[in-house]
């Protein structure tokens, strides 16, 4: 039986692969795929402007290949986890 943390990790990996490869490489997310992932999987997307998604793509795409690989996606998730933790800490003061 999977632990809650293992389920979370499985979800993060399967979510990446659910969107990657719809166009281009199965191992990367294009801008369009990243945008679709964000808009579908994250409630914060409702508040994001197109320019914010473009800026996010640029900041994540460390090798400047116009695609987000799994390592770059992992950095995105880590950043989100840190933001959620900050929110949690602030909310519990």
From Swiss-Prot:
GO terms for molecular function: calcium ion binding; calcium-dependent protein binding; copper ion binding; protein homodimerization activity; zinc ion binding. Ca(2+) 1 binds at residues 28, 33. Residues 12-47, 48-83 form the EF-hand domain. Ca(2+) 2 binds at residues 61, 63, 65, 67, 72. GO terms for cellular component: neuronal cell body; nucleus. Keywords: Calcium, Copper, Metal-binding, Repeat, Zinc. Homodimer. PANTHER family: PROTEIN S100-A5 (PTHR11639:SF65), S100 CALCIUM-BINDING PROTEIN (PTHR11639). Binds calcium, zinc and copper. One subunit can simultaneously bind 2 calcium ions or 2 copper ions plus 1 zinc ion. Calcium and copper ions compete for the same binding sites. This is Protein S100-A5. It comes from Rattus norvegicus (Rat). The gene is S100a5.
């Amino acid at each position: 039986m999977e632990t809650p943390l293992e389920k979370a990790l499985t979800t993060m990996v399967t979510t990446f692969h659910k969107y990657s490869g719809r166009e281009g490489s199965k191992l990367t997310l294009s801008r369009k795929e990243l945008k679709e992932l964000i808009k579908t999987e994250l409630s914060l997307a409702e508040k994001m402007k197109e320019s914010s998604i473009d800026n996010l793509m640029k900041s994540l795409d460390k090798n400047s290949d116009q695609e987000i690989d799994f390592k770059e996606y992992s950095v995105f998730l880590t950043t989100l986890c840190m933001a959620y933790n900050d929110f949690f800490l602030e909310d519990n003061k």
